[in-house]
UniProtKB/Swiss-Prot annotation:
Enzyme class: transferase
UniProt name for this protein: 2-succinyl-5-enolpyruvyl-6-hydroxy-3-cyclohexene-1-carboxylate synthase
InterPro entries (UniProt xref): MenaQ_synth_MenD (IPR004433), THDP-binding (IPR029061), Thiamin_PyroP_enz_TPP-bd_dom (IPR012001), TPP_enzyme_TPP-bd (IPR011766)
Organism: Prochlorococcus marinus (strain AS9601)
Functional summary from the UniProt entry: Catalyzes the thiamine diphosphate-dependent decarboxylation of 2-oxoglutarate and the subsequent addition of the resulting succinic semialdehyde-thiamine pyrophosphate anion to isochorismate to yield 2-succinyl-5-enolpyruvyl-6-hydroxy-3-cyclohexene-1-carboxylate (SEPHCHC).
Pfam families the record matches: TPP_enzyme_C, TPP_enzyme_N
Length: 587
């Protein structure tokens, strides 16, 4: 085999991607570009061998979010390949969300070699710095070019990445300088592939196992504040662990509940199973109604705080002990700064607690009086909602939050976009998300990447329902440019309130109508059927819940992407919802 640069570029690209596949990469999002050609050609050959799936995206921003959706739904490391220059800067929004939501993703970016840096060379920028503030690691192959990178150096880069994902998952930026020639002849490619398949493809690589040791001293220091003879509440926020660890998480949560007998408040995206004992339905409304009457000694908080003003006020005013247990998240996670934080996860915490208390599987406490009271309060709120939210009502956002979990099949996954949907579902969904996988990207809580994230999830978990407002949907409309996006089994429930409805709840009363629209609402007069037609996406508009049920059946049956639009009157929505909330609080 010739030792030319083009052959070395191709061989090292094959070796790098092959090693990334060995540490868990199954899906690769490829963006267009010339500098990344050796990586793209190598990816294509590995795809032919059945080792990795490739999907292309002409927009790097959408590609980043699409890959993040795949990572969240699969629990596996995902990969994006881009060319150099501004292409890399477009990855930042997805990197921010991956950082905050602790999801494993590698951004593999081609770059110019060192000799072209800082001299005015075309499309040559300081891209190695673009993602550094949010990535767990920023790594690089040889600065002179990947052709000068040794095999053991590539292995070391992948080993570092694998170790990072095992301890504190998140985004990694792997920058790959590549010198010309970028293309490779048919003959040279054939020769390199022969060498790669004969020597490297089936070669066994041993990655050092990461032994994640718990800090028993830290556990004892924190757990001494618990008093299991006193009442408490378990608060489960958005789940940040791997979806593959949800069974062990729920097993540990069930054991913890049996040890304590405490009630459980579960976020719509907590990952908690719906059959958990002590699960309080309508807990946010119960909390709002009884905010000064819920007395207990301690709170066990799992994961980040839910998006609930009522819960935040309750935690701020709570005078007892608060313990916060995190899933492989080593950063501070308590904005009210009142908790003892434990970094090693619920499964580890529960295991140590059982050993410390000498508890076996047969020990099971009855539900505490507080748990029984809260269960009853939740049932009373449920009756009020049942009497005021019916399928005959006009469609509103809060009614959608209550009824859609009953209309969409109980085992089918749902994704809730940021802004209004996640908040409405927390208040009104009555734990309806807990029978299924439910996703919402609450790391940075932005509307960025909504469509691309949903398309990524639907590659793994489908048929998927995305619940989104019109602005969040439009913000990421380029998601439709991802390869075969219209063939995903994805239903989009498009809540059309002609602008950012959440701002109606916050700023409208203090601004003139024209000011409010220009500064916050930002309405867009969209011809939705034409927009859907332009992207070749199936479309329906419905005006009542009966038609919505029929539309769901239709969208699932066609097994392709579909938009189902419902129009909302924001002013009527606010008045009706406030009236219902007043009825609940006064009951």
């Amino acid at each position: 085999m010739t030792s030319s640069i083009e052959c070395k570029n191709f061989l090292r690209s094959l070796q790098l991607l092959n090693l990334l596949i060995k540490i868990g990469v199954k899906n690769l999002i490829l963006c267009p570009g010339s500098r990344s050609a050796p990586l793209a050609i190598a990816a294509g050959e590995l795809n032919k061998l059945g080792l990795v799936n490739i999907f292309n995206s002409i927009d790097e921003r959408s590609a980043g979010f699409h890959s993040l959706g795949i990572s969240a739904a699969s629990g596996h490391l995902s990969l994006v390949i881009t060319t150099s220059g501004t292409a890399v800067s477009n990855l930042l929004p997805a990197a921010v969300e991956a950082d905050r939501s602790c999801k494993g993703i590698i951004f593999l970016t081609a770059d110019r070699p060192l000799r072209l840096k800082d001299c005015g060379a075309n499309q040559t920028v300081n891209q190695e710095d673009f993602l550094s503030s949010v990535c767990r690691k920023v790594l690089s192959t040889n600065l002179n070019g990947i052709h000068e990178t040794e095999e053991n150096e590539i292995f070391n880069l992948v080993r570092i990445s694998e170790k990072q994902m095992s301890t504190f998952p998140g985004p990694i930026h792997l920058n790959v300088p590549i010198d010309k020639p970028l293309d490779i002849s048919f003959l040279n490619k054939k020769n390199v592939l022969e060498v790669f398949e004969r020597i490297y493809l089936k070669k066994k690589y041993v990655f050092q196992e990461v032994d994640i040791k718990s800090d028993k001293k830290k556990f004892l220091e924190i757990s001494k504040n618990l008093n299991l003879d006193e009442s408490g509440i378990i608060l489960v926020g958005p789940y940040q662990g791997s979806i593959n660890d949800l069974p062990s998480f729920n097993k540990s949560l069930g054991q913890l509940q049996e040890i304590t007998g405490w009630p459980v408040f579960a976020d719509p995206v907590s990952g908690v199973y719906s059959d958990l004992r002590g699960l309080i339905v309508n807990w946010e409304l119960v909390l709002r109604k009884n905010k000064n009457l819920i007395n207990c000694y301690q709170l066990l908080r799992l994961g980040p705080m839910s998006s609930s003003n009522d819960l935040e006020k309750f935690l701020i005013n709570f005078q007892g002990v608060q313990i916060l247990i995190k899933e492989k998240n080593h950063r501070k996670l308590d904005p009210i700064k009142k908790s003892f934080e434990y970094d090693f996860g619920l499964t580890n915490f529960t295991s140590l607690l059982k050993k410390e208390l000498s508890i076996n599987e047969k020990n099971k406490k009855s539900l505490t009086p507080l748990a029984l009271d809260l269960l009853e309060e939740g049932k009373q709120v449920k009756e009020i909602l049942k009497g005021n939210i019916t399928y005959e009502n006009q469609i509103t956002e809060y009614r959608l939050a209550n009824l859609v979990p009953k209309l969409w099949p109980a085992e089918n996954p749902i994704m809730l976009s940021a802004s209004s949907p996640i908040r409405d579902w927390l208040t009104f969904s009555e734990n309806g998300t807990l029978t299924r996988n439910c996703f919402s990207f609450r790391g940075a809580s932005g509307i960025d990447g909504t469509l691309s994230l949903a398309l990524g999830i639907s590659r793994i978990k489908n048929p998927l329902l995305l619940v989104t407002g019109d602005l969040a949907f439009l913000h990421d409309i380029n998601g439709w440019l991802i390869e075969n996006s219209i063939d995903m089994n994805l239903t989009i429930l498009l809540i059309n309130n002609n602008g950012g409805n959440i701002f109606n709840r916050i700023y409208k009363k203090n601004l003139k109508e024209d000011e409010f629209k220009k500064l916050f609402l930002m309405p867009k007069e969209i011809n939705w059927p034409k927009l859907a037609e332009g992207y070749q996406v199936n479309f329906r508009s419905v005006a009542n819940f009966k038609k919505l049920r029929e539309a769901f059946d239709w969208s699932i049956s066609i097994e392709k992407s579909a938009i189902i639009k419902v129009d909302i009157d924001p002013q009527n929505e606010i008045c009706e919802k406030n009236s219902l909330l007043e009825k609940i609080i006064g009951s």
